[in-house]
């Protein structure tokens, strides 16, 4: 029984290390299988679906590619590192899996964030954080011999050292720190990546000895082939900072040999310009490049140097602030295994209006440079791409004098989308267009404005002149980051991350909500009741809306045609109705007519407004002269209109209002238009009836011909711009489908796993870097590797690979075929003496799996094996004495006897296992029978008790209409009179 238990224990250990989905070895008993089934099913039912849309390929390598994806749940950008495992060697495969292990351990603002990994057939997909600023290598090349400012170098140095400190505290040696592996965001936030060569050490005194890394950044100890530790990473950091200071590689040569010589001798390519940089910074870099590893500082010691210590808190706060917009929480556990749904879509931007009734597709903005947000102004358009770049151009009708609202540094009329180069390096999250100006918000919450400052919409008290031709930052919000911005024709309103509202610009009709009609040229804080949490701001041409978390709407400004929804209809006692009109309001007032709905989106136009509630229903109010309310007529409407008709039963997801027209998109991928169709406003030629000089339609009419999903939509004046997407195909990828779970991989790489030494030092061995692993993960347990190498040669394992009687599993057979050759001992006695006490604990597994294979191998291999192992043969004398080595004649027969004995033990164990399974089945059957009898007895007892109680009650109070026989028929047989 103990032998069988050890056998099963060892199989479980191997299966767990190799990611086996079975709970144990061999045939599972009914109990465990039954218990695993519901658990697996329950896990599958709870799996989260994550939806991704591919954007473009960032780069290709020999074994895969990196692709940019947009995750639709939070509209974030991620990178999928796709690795074709079939094209990798076993070492390269382990490196890929090792990167997952390392990244899963690390969580730091200056380290590339790992989100998930998936398996698509034989392709490993690693989901990582996207850095939109390229890498440090390209950043240095773009300098073109213009040295960095010391402040920028110190900023980079602090972030790099902070990341290295984090990985070293986790016991991880990076081993490939270089400028190509240091990534940047557009806000100059450093992200240290590429952990494929990283290694986990047991302690700060542990050493490694495998030759890995990039030659230009190798430390002297690596070049000399001696053991190295965390100080090797510090050397690489010194090389990177030296490169930042000189824009040249620290060590350079024409061939690797000369390069190693220069590294060992400390012959640098050039020296740092001491007139450009402080002595303290230069000395810090030189200390990292000390030839003696012991003299190099640790990462924590570098952070404690005065140059970094005096600004450490300030830079830490800056890193946290810059990282906040893109920071995404990790899953609570690594075992949740979500499902990835990858949907390929075409993404296009269309514009119409201004005399063009046919939608015009923009070729500049398309897949690969797709749009995430669009905005229309009276004279121009603006688009933010998925990579957070801003494009602007004039609208189609043109002819209007520009005031710099395009932000290109001039007043030229660019009729095609043009990238605003002055914002290069800034990640633009949102843009809003006014009449002749533009305001945008970055990921960091900073505000940039450009265009006309006639009404003070630049927010800088008119100090920049009447026109601003290039994006200008509003320093007012440096310490109070902005969440959202909205522009009217001549005013601006913003919502900060602290949920505060600020407004400035033209104050006519009280549109700023500041209790006056004064114009303000700098941002002014708006008083909002503290009980209300504002979640969105939206400006009309001469009014403003605030949307609260509870779905309430506050409005201020001009309420002409009741377009703010502020008018009240009151009923008297004797059917007398009074209609109270509010012409305008200078402070934010609750729109009571909208209080019956929980509003989620509001879209003001020039004369009317549309809103979407939490149920996807569309509401309209305001002027209905051209049928823009979509109610099927052109009559004046006093209140709020809940749209039915063509939109009845549909969920509206996007809506926008222009000058006397409305465009809406539904969740079933339809686009509707209604209202004034003049000058191409509706992208169609309505035939309902002429209305004055314009062509109008009062019912929502479908446009665009085919089904399109609309991520964003904007109307202003006569113009409309929208993003349309069509699904090409969709694919579902289930995470960890082949057992490549993080827990599995890390279990094998942990100190207790395969290959780890026990003396406090963990060393890279040649076997670790070259021994193949057919499982796709790391090797198995240390006991299994030792035992197999000591008892079976690859030749013998191959000889039995096709045998019908072999019980060796396929994965184990492949392991044996690729195992290192170790000679076979000559006789049973040395064989048994070769095992230590710890190895004897797992001997049954070796006997069951290994020796059975060895016993059936061709015997002609045995003399060669024995002749090659004089160390284990007591009959062979020392080679140094010159005595010829002759194998004993009885060795083969002795070994055969030992093998036969072990075969008998195998059969005995298997028979015992089968017997135990049969006994378990019998016991289970008996228990079921006993349970049934027990339940039957309990039911009879309860029934008898109830009958006896009823009989006693009958005797005490007999019913006159029932005789004793009929009463007894309601009970059990025990109450019948005996015949």
Swiss-Prot record:
Signal peptide: none annotated. Autophosphorylated on serine and threonine residues. When complexed with FACT, exhibits markedly elevated phosphorylation on Thr-210. During mitosis, not phosphorylated on Thr-210. Phosphorylated by CDK1 in vitro. ATP binds at residues 58-66, 81. It is found in: Cytoplasm; Nucleus. SMART domains: S_TKc. Pfam families: Pkinase (PF00069), WD40_RLD (PF25390). Dimerizes through its coiled-coil domain. This is Serine/threonine-protein kinase Nek9.
